[in-house]
C-alpha cells in the first residue's frame, strides 16, 4: 500500500461516529489522510456535536494537520413511522396504507408517517420508493390523510425508513426548525462548512446562508455552504444552486432513488464539471467503500468508483457509515488514500492548464491562473499563493495540475476551509505588511518545510497592499538560492 505521506491532490471526508469517536483512533485517521471530518446532525444531541468538534480540533492539533469540520444538517424527515414488531415483511401485490393521522404502531396493513404532507404530495399512479428504493409502492388512491398503495416490489420494511417519490415532487422544505437550531450549534464551534440536505432551488441555499450569517455573527465567522444534490427537482436548478453556494455534494443515495440508478454516473460527471467551471468545490459521496463496513478490503467495483471520481476531478471523496459505524475505519481511510494517489499518478492533466480563449473578469483571478499557466510550462516545483480569503488558491485548484499548490495564510479559519480544496496544502504563516519582506519570509517558510530547495523554481502570488481580501495583483517567479 502507498504510504499515507505520499502527496495526494484529492481530499478525504470521513464521518465521525461510534466506530471512530475514540480520540487516539481519530488522530490516527487524520494522520492517515483525513482532511475533513463530517458531523452527521441526523444523530446525537447538540452537546454531542460540540464535544465531538472539540475532539476533532484537539486530534488535528496533536497530528499537526489542518482539518476542516463539516456540519451536515438532517433536513426534512420524510420517513415512515414505527412498527409494533420493529419491522414487517411486505409481499408483492399486498395492499399497504401510509397514514399521516395514524398514532398506533404499524403492522402488515399500514404504518404512520413522520412526514404529514405526503397525502397532499401524491396522486394515483405515483410510485413511492422506500428504504433507498428497495421497496416500491404504487399509489392507488388518496383518502384524507391515508395513502392507499399496492406493493410492487416487496421486502423487509423497518422503523423510520425513508420515503422518496420517483421523479421527485415532495414539497418538504429543505430547512426545518431542527436544522435552524443545529446551525446555531454548528456556529458555536465555528464549523468550517455547513452541508444543506435536500435543497431544490437557489432560494433554499440563500435561506441557509442567511441563517448561518446571523448565527455566526457573534463569532465573526463565515462558513462555507455545501448544497447536497439529492432531489430530482434540484437538477434543473443546478447552475443557480451552485451560484449561491460554495460547493455541492453529489449525494448519490437519495438522488439515485429519485432519478434512477442508471442516470447517476452521467449526472455525477456533469456536476463535477459544472462545479469546477463555476469555481466551486465538489464532494462525491455515498457507498464509495460500502463493503468495508464489514470487510477489511474494498471490492474491485468500489476501487473503480473512487478512482473514477478522482479522474473526473472531484475535490473530495466521502466516507459515511464506513468510518462512522464500520469495523475498519482506519483501514478504509488508508485504502482510499491509496486509490486516490494511484488514480492521480496515472492521469494526464496537462491540457487542463491551457487557458487559450478564456476571459477573466477579475484581476486576482487573472493573476492566479496566470501563475498556474506559467508554473506548468516552466516545470516549477511548487505553486504558492499568499492568501487572506483563500480565493486565489481556490481558483488555482479548479484546474488539474501535477504541481502542488501551497496556500500561505495568516488566518486559521481560511487554512481550515482550504483543507477541502483539491491539490491545495494550506499552511498557517504570519507575514509582514511589507511585500518584499513577506515574499522573503514565504521562501524561508517553504525551505524550512522542504517544499523547495536550492535551484528549484516556484511561482508565488500576493497582493499589494498585503492582507487585503481579494487583493491579489502580483505574480513572481523565483529560483531558490
Model segments located where?
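Non-catalytic helical/linker scaffolds that mediate oligomerization, partner binding
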Residues: 1-481
Amino acid at each position: 500500500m502507498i504510504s499515507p505521506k505520499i502527496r495526494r491532490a484529492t481530499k478525504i471526508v470521513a464521518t465521525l461516529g461510534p466506530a471512530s469517536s475514540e480520540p487516539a483512533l481519530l488522530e490516527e485517521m487524520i494522520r492517515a489522510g483525513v482532511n475533513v471530518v463530517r458531523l452527521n446532525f441526523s444523530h446525537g444531541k447538540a452537546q454531542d456535536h460540540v464535544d465531538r468538534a472539540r475532539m476533532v480540533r484537539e486530534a488535528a492539533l496533536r497530528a499537526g494537520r489542518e482539518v476542516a469540520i463539516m456540519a451536515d444538517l438532517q433536513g426534512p424527515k420524510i420517513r415512515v413511522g414505527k412498527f409494533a414488531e420493529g419491522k414487517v415483511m411486505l409481499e408483492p401485490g399486498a395492499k399497504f396504507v401510509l397514514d399521516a393521522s395514524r398514532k398506533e404502531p404499524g403492522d402488515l396493513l399500514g404504518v404512520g408517517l413522520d412526514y404529514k404532507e405526503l397525502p397532499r404530495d401524491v396522486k394515483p399512479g405515483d410510485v413511492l420508493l422506500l428504504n433507498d428504493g428497495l421497496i416500491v409502492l404504487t399509489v392507488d388512491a388518496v383518502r384524507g390523510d391515508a395513502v392507499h398503495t399496492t406493493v410492487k416490489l416487496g421486502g423487509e420494511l423497518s422503523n423510520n425508513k425513508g420515503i422518496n417519490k420517483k421523479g421527485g415532487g415532495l414539497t418538504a422544505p429543505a430547512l426545518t426548525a431542527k436544522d435552524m437550531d443545529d446551525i446555531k450549534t454548528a456556529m458555536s464551534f465555528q464549523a468550517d462548512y455547513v452541508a444543506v440536505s435536500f435543497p431544490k432551488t437557489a432560494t433554499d441555499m440563500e435561506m441557509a446562508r442567511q441563517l448561518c450569517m446571523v448565527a455566526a455573527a457573534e463569532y465573526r465567522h463565515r462558513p462555507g455552504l455545501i448544497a447536497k444534490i439529492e432531489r430530482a427537482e434540484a437538477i434543473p436548478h443546478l447552475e443557480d444552486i451552485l451560484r449561491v453556494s460554495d460547493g455541492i455534494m453529489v449525494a448519490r443515495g437519495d438522488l439515485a432513488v429519485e432519478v434512477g440508478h442508471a442516470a447517476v454516473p452521467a449526472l455525477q460527471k456533469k456536476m463535477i464539471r459544472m462545479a469546477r467551471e463555476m469555481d466551486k468545490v465538489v464532494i462525491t459521496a455515498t457507498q464509495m467503500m460500502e463493503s468495508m463496513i464489514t470487510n477489511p478490503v474494498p471490492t474491485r467495483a468500489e476501487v473503480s468508483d473512487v478512482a473514477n471520481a478522482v479522474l473526473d476531478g472531484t475535490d473530495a471523496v466521502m466516507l459515511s457509515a464506513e468510518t462512522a459505524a464500520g469495523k475498519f475505519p482506519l483501514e478504509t481511510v488508508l485504502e482510499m488514500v491509496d486509490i486516490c494517489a494511484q488514480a492521480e499518478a496515472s492521469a494526464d492533466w496537462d491540457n487542463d492548464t491551457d487557458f487559450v480563449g478564456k476571459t477573466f473578469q477579475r484581476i486576482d483571478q487573472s493573476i492566479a491562473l496566470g501563475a498556474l499557466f506559467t508554473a506548468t510550462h516552466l516545470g516549477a516545483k511548487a505553486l504558492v499563493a499568499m492568501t487572506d480569503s483563500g480565493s486565489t488558491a481556490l481558483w488555482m485548484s479548479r484546474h488539474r495540475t501535477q504541481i502542488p499548490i501551497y496556500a500561505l495564510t495568516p488566518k486559521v479559519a481560511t487554512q481550515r476551509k482550504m483543507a477541502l480544496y483539491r491539490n491545495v496544502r494550506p499552511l498557517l504563516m504570519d507575514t509582514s505588511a511589507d511585500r518584499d519582506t513577506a515574499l522573503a519570509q514565504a521562501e524561508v517558510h517553504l525551505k524550512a518545510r522542504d517544499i523547495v530547495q536550492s535551484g528549484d523554481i516556484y511561482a508565488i502570488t500576493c497582493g499589494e497592499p498585503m492582507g487585503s481580501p481579494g487583493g491579489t495583483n502580483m505574480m513572481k517567479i523565483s529560483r531558490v538560492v
